[in-house]
A protein has these predicted regions:
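Non-catalytic helical/linker scaffolds that mediate oligomerization, partner binding
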Residues: 1-273
Length: 273
């Protein structure tokens, strides 16, 4: 499989599966290491805050440009309709104001905030399409208040320690304190894992913030999916180059992720792009 093909780091995504399955996979990697006298790094990727819509009665709806659509933090979880859907992150109305732009499902759906009415976010659809259950929500330009480390992440850090992970990646850090907290929790759990900061929030790009994040981390990941949605795709290539240069200048490794060689999912050779 991929181990024989020469992979040198395995990423375990805490957004999926459970502790038992994660530990079983890692045991397979460690067994392969011993049998082949090699080293394969184990990177365990924390899920981070889930800022998502809830689900629809019919699992999906088709939104058209100009439609009025409401995100309602008090709507029951599975009762979304053509005109409204619940949200898992109950603080979202407090983070927004009229004129904000929300991007759903990695930017496929674009909503303009018209008004905040208590628990309801009233919006107009600027870019429509099919919206299905549990899709992510981003705020153009950043500014959502969700903490980078959730209670689930803190539990998963103990799993990473149990698995003797080599690296732990923290999702959506806003400042260096998020990295320091992750390192502290790892140390308390008995882990020597190095911490990787996934750069995917607009706030993390500020000069003083990104420099301190890089200093506190063993390496960074340019998470082009969420970052591109927050800052806009036209800004992404320049920021990607900037982050790579900053990491190298500080003697930190850097991973560039999301849609890298994606064509090779279905093709044995990459495109020229």
């Amino acid at each position: 499989g991929i181990l024989d093909a020469g992979v040198n780091v395995i990423r375990i995504n805490f957004s999926h599966n459970n502790e038992k399955e994660h530990l079983e996979r890692i045991a397979q990697v460690r067994k392969y290491e011993k049998e082949n006298d090699t080293f394969i790094g184990v990177l365990m990727d924390l899920q981070g805050p889930k800022i998502r819509i809830s689900s629809f009665i019919d699992n999906k709806v088709l939104l058209s440009r100009g439609d009025q659509f409401t995100l309602d933090s008090e709507l029951p979880k599975s009762e979304g309709t053509q005109t409204a859907v619940g949200i898992a992150y109950k603080q979202l109305p407090n983070d927004l104001s009229a004129g904000n732009t929300l991007l759903l499902d990695d930017g496929k759906i674009i909503l303009k905030v018209l008004q905040i009415d208590g628990p309801k976010i009233l919006t107009e659809v600027l870019q429509g399409g099919t919206l299905s259950n549990n899709k992510g929500i981003n705020l153009r330009g950043g500014g959502l208040s969700a903490s980078a480390l959730t209670e689930k992440d803190k539990q998963d850090i103990h799993t990473a320690a149990k698995a003797d992970a080599d690296y732990v990646a923290i999702s959506f850090p806003i400042h260096a304190d998020d990295i320091r907290e992750t390192k502290r929790l790892l140390m308390e759990a008995g882990s020597n894992a190095s911490v990787i900061a996934k750069i995917e929030r607009a706030e993390a790009l500020q000069e003083d913030v990104i420099n301190e994040i890089i200093q506190e981390s063993a390496g960074i990941m340019v998470a082009r999916g969420d970052l591109g949605v927050e800052i806009g795709d036209p800004q992404l290539p320049a920021q990607q180059k900037r982050l790579i240069l900053l990491a190298r200048a500080n003697d930190r490794f850097v991973i560039t992720a999301t849609q890298m060689l994606e064509s090779m999912i279905t093709s044995p050779i990459p495109t020229r792009a």
